[in-house]
């Protein structure tokens, strides 16, 4: 049987699958269930400085290409999130499943404080969300838009905590490699790529957007090629592990993401139809693919596309 164990920044994962932030990462019981269903690590929903109700309904819609959402970073605030994370960590520890805690902030100067509060729960890693695409009307241009602003946020978080940090980047920028280099230079231990892709759906019969917020973030199968390209590009310019997220719903999808250069593979929208059981399904399919193709472990696949990209078919 192929070995799925991953050493990620000194953190042991039983397999490379990660519950992506924003999907089921809202309560200890739900995150524990994901762990029991076979996820390698769980990421909590992003927490900010204070409670947010998010956008008005409708905020999400499943469609043939995946999911579009404009939930709007609904969260209880970092202080209220702290006991949730503490309880989650307590439940996950006996299962050998690490906890990644996601944070965001509306202002540069707030990131350090949110990180300090969340660090009290002792998560295994803090994921810094600087790239949510559907709150620009509230917070302005995302910090992920430029290398300078992304680096400034990373610097604030790095000064505030000693925990490993992963910065979550956006796909809709022209200089993704430059931004990746900038956050690593300021202390990012890893990079998460990608966040959802800005998009819009219209109800032609009603002649209006399907979301109350008008636009939202696309996820699911439709964005997998975008995510693969982003992970491939980032892995060529920085020497830190990448959590590749976007459009993963099968073992083949996971294998492709690892071949593009990802160390871990985030799973999100696939849970809309498959529920937490999707983690076991993907792991089984990944192992079967590796067995059939002669891969003994994940390292033998990681980044393989870089070595074969110019081969003649």
Sequence positions of predicted segments:
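Alpha/beta catalytic cores of nucleotide-metabolism and tRNA/nucleoside-modifying enzymes
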Residues: 1, 218-239, 243, 249-313
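N-terminal capping/small domains of soluble enzymes
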Residues: 1-99, 104-106, 282
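Alpha/beta enzyme core
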Residues: 32-37, 106-243, 251-262, 267
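Short gly/pro/ser/thr-enriched loop/turn and capping motifs at secondary-structure boundaries
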Residues: 48-53, 133-135, 198-201, 271-274
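Short low-complexity, flexible loop/linker segments enriched in glycine and/or proline
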Residues: 57-60, 141-143, 206-209, 279-283
């Amino acid at each position: 049987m192929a070995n799925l164990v991953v050493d990620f920044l000194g953190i042991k994962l039983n397999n490379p699958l990660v519950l992506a932030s924003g999907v089921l990462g809202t309560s200890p019981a739900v995150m524990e269930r994901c762990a029991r269903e076979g996820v390698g690590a769980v990421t909590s929903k992003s927490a900010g400085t204070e409670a947010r109700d998010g956008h008005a309904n409708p905020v999400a819609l499943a469609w043939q290409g995946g999911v579009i959402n404009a939930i709007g970073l609904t969260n209880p605030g970092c202080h209220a999130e702290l006991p949730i994370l503490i309880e989650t960590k307590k439940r996950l520890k006996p299962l050998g499943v690490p906890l990644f805690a996601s944070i965001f902030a509306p202002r540069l100067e707030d990131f350090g404080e949110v990180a300090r509060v969340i660090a009290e729960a002792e998560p295994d890693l803090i994921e810094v969300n600087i790239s949510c695409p559907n709150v620009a009307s509230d917070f302005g241009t995302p910090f992920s838009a430029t290398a300078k602003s992304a680096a400034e946020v990373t610097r604030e978080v790095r000064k505030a905590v000693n925990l490993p940090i992963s910065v979550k980047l956006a796909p809709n920028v022209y200089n993704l490699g430059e931004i990746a280099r900038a956050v690593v230079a300021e202390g990012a231990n890893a990079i998460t790529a990608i966040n959802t892709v800005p998009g819009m759906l219209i109800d032609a019969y009603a002649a209006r957007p399907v979301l109350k917020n008008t636009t939202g973030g696309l996820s699911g199968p439709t964005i997998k090629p975008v995510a693969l390209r982003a992970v491939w590009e980032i892995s060529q310019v920085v020497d830190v592990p990448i959590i590749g997220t976007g459009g993963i719903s099968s073992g083949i999808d996971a294998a492709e993401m690892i071949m593009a250069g990802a160390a871990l593979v985030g799973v999100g929208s696939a849970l809309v139809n498959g529920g937490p059981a999707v983690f076991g399904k993907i792991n089984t399919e990944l192992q079967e693919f590796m067995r059939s193709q002669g891969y003994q472990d994940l390292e033998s696949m990681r980044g393989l596309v870089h070595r074969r990209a110019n081969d003649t078919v």
